[in-house]
């Protein structure tokens, strides 16, 4: 495997262990260290490799449709999940919940969630995805590597957070893996198709802000979280994001390669 890929994966897992360990010891800043560890790892590897900001994807390029997908994808998927739950009486909203209250709370949560999304996406889609692409790793394998790394990266934090899930671990683990993999394929494709990291940042921030709002106190009087949770591991969410991932892959790829200015330096690529 390409040395910088190994360096990044080792660094991001190592920093996540440090942050989660601090969190388990009662040091709250450990949660922030964990959340920002993909960005920290990317900076470390970029400095060691002398890469600077090349290949991050800070430009706003590509077709607007990919940006719209990033904006509406998670609100639509969560609406389907919760809506189906309401339809079959597996979800009951709190008595004071309204569309306006959920929207206002989501907007209020958006700014901090954008910061956290930058912390993650500048590592996953801002470094690892384009690094694999520059080294001629096919898209399916690219997103699978990123998705598996993303899943494993969560493990220390999940173990440090006893209330992270109410599902038994044997059931939660495969569902969570499927949910994260579906997201990795979608967000990875937005990165490769637009050559920009921003669609992934937007999608991640919006999805996170809305999800945590919906899971806030009083929003649901009751919910069958196994099937209809708005989180990635909800079964309906897995189905919806899986369908989106399949549809995204059916979009024809452009025949022309990305411009040289968006590719990683030659010394990071296989000759």
What are these regions (language model features)?
Residues 13, 36, 71, 106, ...:
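Residue-level signature of the transmembrane alpha-helical core
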Residues 13-21, 75-83, 148-157, 205-218:
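Aromatic-anchored segments of alpha-helical transmembrane domains
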């Amino acid at each position: 495997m390409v040395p910088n890929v190994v360096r990044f994966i080792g660094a991001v897992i190592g920093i996540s262990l440090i942050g989660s360990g601090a969190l388990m010891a009662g040091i709250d800043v450990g949660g922030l260290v964990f959340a920002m560890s993909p960005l920290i790892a990317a900076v470390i590897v970029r400095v060691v490799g002398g890469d600077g900001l090349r290949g991050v994807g800070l430009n706003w390029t590509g077709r607007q449709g990919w940006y719209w997908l990033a904006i509406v994808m998670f609100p639509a998927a969560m609406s389907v999940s919760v809506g189906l739950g309401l339809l079959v009486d597996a979800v009951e909203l709190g008595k004071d919940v309204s569309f306006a209250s959920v929207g206002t709370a989501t907007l209020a949560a958006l700014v901090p969630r954008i910061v956290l999304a930058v912390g993650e996406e500048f590592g996953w889609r801002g470094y690892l995805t384009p690094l694999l692409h520059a080294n001629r790793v096919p898209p399916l394998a690219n997103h699978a590597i990123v998705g598996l790394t993303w899943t494993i990266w969560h493990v220390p934090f999940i173990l440090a957070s006893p209330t992270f899930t109410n599902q038994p671990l044997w059931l939660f683990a495969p569902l969570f893996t499927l949910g994260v993999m579906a997201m990795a394929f979608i967000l990875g494709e937005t990165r490769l198709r637009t050559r920009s990291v921003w669609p992934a940042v937007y999608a991640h921030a919006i999805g996170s802000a809305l999800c945590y709002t919906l899971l806030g106190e009083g929003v649901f009087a009751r919910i069958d979280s196994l099937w209809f949770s708005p989180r990635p591991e909800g079964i309906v969410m897995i189905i919806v994001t899986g369908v989106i991932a399949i549809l995204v892959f059916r979009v024809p790829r452009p025949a022309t390669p990305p411009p040289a200015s968006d590719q990683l330096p030659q010394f990071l690529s296989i000759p």
